[in-house]
């Protein structure tokens, strides 16, 4: 907390460029300091908390990192929470395997393709293995230990134990709780033990996506922050196939996906990416996908969810006028 503008600016400038700072300022202090800190990479978002919204709202429009001008504390907390959720989702790394016939891809194709095949076999095995109450209890206990002292998540765990049923799995997956965080982390890091313990819930997601499988061709979008190294790996494999080794959440609304990227500040070694995906349910795909809006914790998000291990063909990668990389893919 700072009363002095110079001290505040100096503190921000001394932070590492990898730090991510959310700044809350008063209206008067904001007018003094925002012009000097707005361009700093460490600052990802600014909120103006003041008594006179009208006096500062028009002025704040000049600065893209100013997310909102608010007079109510609850509204401020709600806005920061919502924006943080979006930022986390976009920055969460994707686990991608490439199946390539490109001998110049820079790696042994046997090694690269082996990872791709393994990811496919893993999903198929998980869907066939029976689960037991012992495994479910072990998962719950591991999560309780992980979130010890976090009363919000412990309450979520208690509710999960009491009320979970297979038809609620999409609701639980889309709610920002231990369930989403732990499952996604396990899939992203290929933590086989944790994935094994989650297998009954992965099966439940699979069955629900099958039940609500989209019946018509869809074009969907996903905002993503991607490392330059990851992006280069995809650019070197245009025309090849990729497997997404986690649940792949997308939106039917392109304008919203682009808007979210427009507000994001990237790290030095990262780029803003928009996936554009054509998904036709009439092709012989083995992995289901569905519009889960009616079954989601956030029913207004027009979310289309693809099953773990969904395979896409990389069609094209180009940068648009807003310096966003557009990756065009087709579901296989």
Residues covered by each model-derived region:
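Mono-ADP-ribosyltransferase
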Residues: 1-332
């Amino acid at each position: 907390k700072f009363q002095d503008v110079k001290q505040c600016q100096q503190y921000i400038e001394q932070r590492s460029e990898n730090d991510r700072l959310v700044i809350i300022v008063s209206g008067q202090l904001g007018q003094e300091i925002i012009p000097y800190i707005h361009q700093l990479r460490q600052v990802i978002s600014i909120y103006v908390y003041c008594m006179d919204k009208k006096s500062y709202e028009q002025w704040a429009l000049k600065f893209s990192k100013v997310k909102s001008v608010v007079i109510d504390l609850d509204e401020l907390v709600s806005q920061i929470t919502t924006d943080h959720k979006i930022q986390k989702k976009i920055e969460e790394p994707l686990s991608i395997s490439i199946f390539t016939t490109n001998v110049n891809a820079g790696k042994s194709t046997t090694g690269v393709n082996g990872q791709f095949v393994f990811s496919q076999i893993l999903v198929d095995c998980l869907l066939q293995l029976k689960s037991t109450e012992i495994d479910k209890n072990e998962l719950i206990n591991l999560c309780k230990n992980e979130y010890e002292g976090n009363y919000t998540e412990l309450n979520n765990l208690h509710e999960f134990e009491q009320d979970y049923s297979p038809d609620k799995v999409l609701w639980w997956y889309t709610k920002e709780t231990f369930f989403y965080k732990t499952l996604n982390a396990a899939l992203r890091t290929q933590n086989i033990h944790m994935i094994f313990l989650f297998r009954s819930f992965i099966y439940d997601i699979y069955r629900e996506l099958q039940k609500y499988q989209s019946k018509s061709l869809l074009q969907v979008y996903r905002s993503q922050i991607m490392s330059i190294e990851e992006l280069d790996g995809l650019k070197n494999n245009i025309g090849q196939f990729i497997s997404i080794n986690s649940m792949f959440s997308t939106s039917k609304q392109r304008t919203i996906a682009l808007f979210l990227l427009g507000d994001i500040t990237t790290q030095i070694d990262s780029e803003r990416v928009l996936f554009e995906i054509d998904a036709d349910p009439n092709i012989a795909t083995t992995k289901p996908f569905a519009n889960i809006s009616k079954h989601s914790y956030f029913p207004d998000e027009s979310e289309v969810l693809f099953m773990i291990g969904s395979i896409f063909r990389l069609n094209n990668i180009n940068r648009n006028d807003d310096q966003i990389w557009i990756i065009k893919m087709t579901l296989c």
